[in-house]
Amino acid sequence: MTTTRHSSTDSVNIPGWGWQPFLEDAVQALQPLNLEPYPVANDFLYKQDQTGSKAKPITVTTATWACKTDKFRQVRAACVYGGTAASVLNFVINPSARFDLPFFGGDLVTLPSGHLLALDLQPADKSDEAHTQQVWEKLIPIFERWRSKLPDGGPIPEEAQPFFSPGFLWTRLPLGDEGDQLINSVVRPAFNDYLSLYLELAEAAKPVGDDRRDHLLKGQRRYTDYRAEKDPARGMLTRFHGSDWTEKYIHTVLFDL
């Protein structure tokens, strides 16, 4: 199956892709805002290739949904589906540095080994109490509500810790009925709770002065530079679509600040 997407806000519909309901929830939650398409080159709006062996080829599809608003520099969803090889939704909201907001991050990954699922409101500067306190006071109760229902995903690397909040919800789930049930009954409502809080914080956010903007922008760049360098999807995307396409996608779409 092939499809054409002319704009980054055109709907994404990938047959068999398990994270479709999550993307639809997010797009629906954003509808009250004044959404404008975010500029994404045609080659990254929709890409299909073949992977696997000659005897058992696998069609892989990567699509990008993206928009911008007055307070969000970029909202983007990287959607990847390669049958049993991989199914991914990486949904990130990059706020404008004119507003004292964290990032929203949802990373939902299915691999042959299982599901790896992460949600967070990620700080631009974790050491800045003025930036984090109002967020964490509201985030931690939501985190506590859902983490008790999920197995812990394990430790995160020390070098990554500055980029995650104490409300980082991170789990690994098995393939099959047990994992699917937890995704539907726990992970999806948790995703929507995190996103609802983020949109509530954004609605209340007021513009900051130039010095504060510069401080936040510096922190945002630290985050995006780190993510671009360490993107765990690099190997998978390179295998699916080649190195040149992958590096351009990472640096000009996913982490383009």
Swiss-Prot record:
UniProt key word Cell membrane: no
For this protein, what is any one GO molecular function term?
cobalt ion binding
EC assignment: the record states 1.3.7.3
Instruction: Fetch the InterPro entries from UniProt.
Output: Ferredoxin-dep_bilin_Rdtase, Phycoerythrobilin_Fdx_Rdtase
Going by the UniProt record, its keywords in alphabetical order are: Oxidoreductase
Keyword Oxidoreductase tagged: yes
Listed under GO biological process in this entry are: phytochromobilin biosynthetic process
* Main EC class the enzyme belongs to: oxidoreductase
Functionally, this protein is described as follows: Catalyzes the two-electron reduction of the C2 and C3(1) diene system of 15,16-dihydrobiliverdin.
| Protein name, as recorded | Phycoerythrobilin:ferredoxin oxidoreductase
Species, as recorded: Synechococcus sp. (strain CC9902)
Gene symbol here is pebB
